Amino acid sequence: MNVLVTGANGFIGKNLIVHLNELGMHTIAYTRENSTQELPDLIKKSDFIVHLAGENRPKDEKDFNTVNAGLTTSICKSVRALGKKIPILLASSIQATFDNAYGKSKLDAELIVKRFESDTGNPVYICRLPG
């Protein structure tokens, strides 16, 4: 199985990649160094997507939405364009219920994948992590 991991250089991403590789899975890393233009080719090679990438300390609060909701939108659009169902696990935050820019951006990302699942039948899983 080929697993695309966004946020692959983060704490969870690095450890998840090690674990998945130990289980014999092939991992595809997507980091801040990648561009969204690379996503379609990476997704084309994927059987499962673990979307961990997110912004939590931007210089400008607008970057919360650009990264947290924008990248999620790009992933969903790329999967839709392929015409095949690729399960997506979205790492969200318990702060998705908070009234702040970070929480709103995480909630927006959740709503994007839920709408994507509703529109396409593509499996989506959301994990609200603490912190």
Language model features: what each stretch is:
Residues 6, 49-53, 88-93, 127-129:
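SDR active-site strand-loop-helix element
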Residues 25-34:
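Conserved glycine-rich Rossmann-like NAD(P)H-binding loop of the short-chain dehydrogenase/reductase
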